[in-house]
C-alpha cells in the first residue's frame, strides 16, 4: 500500500522522470505519427488499471494495434461501455476481451468500507491484517455513499457479470464476441473463464 509521501517532492521527482522518458521516446518515435486512427487489429481490451498489468506485453500489442480501456477492476461500467461502443461504432473493432486479474485490490473492500473511509478523511488509507484504517487527518466527504464502486467478491463471477452486461447492452451488436479471461499475476498467464466466453459468443 502507498506510503504518505510529501507530495511536492514526490511529484517533482515523478514529473522529471516522466518528461525524461518522453524525451527518449520522442527521439525514437520513428513513423508512429503516420498510424491510422482505427486500431489495426480491430479488437479492444477492457482490463484493470493495476500497475502490475501491462496489456501491451501480455497481449502482444504495439502502438496502433488495439484499444485498451482501463479502470479499477476492469469493470463494465457505464463509461467503459461508452468507450466500447465508440470503439466499434466509429473505429471498427470486431472482438472484445474482458480481462480481470488475480490478487485484485477491488476484492479488498466493499461499497460500505469505501464510503466510510471517505467520510472519515480524504487522505490515503492503509490496510493490515485487521482491515482498512484511516489516518483521520483533514476533512472527509459523504459523497462516496452515492457511488457504486463496483467491487469484486470473486473473479470468475465478476468476469461473467461484466461479459453479460456488455452483451446484453442495447447499444452492443450481437455479432461482436466478448471473451472472458483472468490474468494470473504470479505467472503472467491469461486463464479463460469458459462460462464468460460462452456467454459472450456471437448470437
Could you tell me what each predicted segment is?
Residues 85-86, 98:
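Metabolite-binding pocket within alpha/beta catalytic cores that recognizes anionic/polar moieties
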Residues 22, 45, 69, 98, ...:
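Divalent metal-coordination and catalytic microenvironments
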Residues 58, 62, 71, 103, ...:
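Short glycine/serine/threonine-biased micro-segments
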Residues 17, 43-47, 95:
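Short, hydrophobic/glycine-enriched beta-strand segments
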Residues 2-39, 74-76, 86-91, 106-203:
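Divalent-metal-activated hydrolytic enzyme cores
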Residues 49-52, 102-106:
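Gly/Ser/Thr-rich loops at beta-strand to alpha-helix junctions
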Residues 91-104:
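Ordered, amphipathic secondary-structure segments that act as subunit-interaction surfaces
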Residues 28-82:
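Conserved beta-strand-loop surface patch within small alpha/beta domains used
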Amino acid at each position: 500500500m502507498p506510503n504518505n509521501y510529501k507530495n511536492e517532492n514526490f511529484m517533482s521527482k515523478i514529473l522529471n522522470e516522466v518528461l525524461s522518458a518522453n524525451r527518449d521516446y520522442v527521439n525514437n518515435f520513428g513513423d508512429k505519427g503516420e498510424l491510422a486512427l482505427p486500431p489495426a487489429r480491430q479488437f479492444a481490451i477492457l482490463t484493470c488499471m493495476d500497475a502490475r498489468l501491462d496489456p501491451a506485453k501480455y497481449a502482444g500489442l504495439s502502438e496502433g494495434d488495439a484499444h485498451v480501456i482501463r479502470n479499477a477492476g476492469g469493470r463494465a461500467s457505464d463509461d467503459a461501455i461508452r468507450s466500447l461502443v465508440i470503439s466499434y461504432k466509429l473505429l471498427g473493432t470486431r472482438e472484445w476481451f474482458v480481462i480481470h486479474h488475480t490478487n485484485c485490490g477491488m476484492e479488498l473492500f466493499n461499497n460500505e468500507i469505501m464510503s466510510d473511509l471517505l467520510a472519515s478523511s480524504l487522505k490515503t488509507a492503509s490496510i493490515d491484517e485487521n482491515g482498512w484504517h484511516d489516518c483521520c487527518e483533514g476533512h472527509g466527504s459523504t459523497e462516496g455513499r452515492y457511488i457504486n464502486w463496483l467491487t469484486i467478491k470473486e473473479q470468475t463471477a465478476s468476469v461473467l457479470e461484466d461479459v453479460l452486461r456488455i452483451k446484453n447492452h442495447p447499444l452492443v451488436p450481437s455479432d461482436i464476441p466478448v471473451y472472458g479471461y483472468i490474468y494470473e499475476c504470479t505467472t503472467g498467464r491469461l486463464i479463460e473463464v469458459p462460462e464468460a466466453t460462452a456467454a459472450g459468443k456471437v448470437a
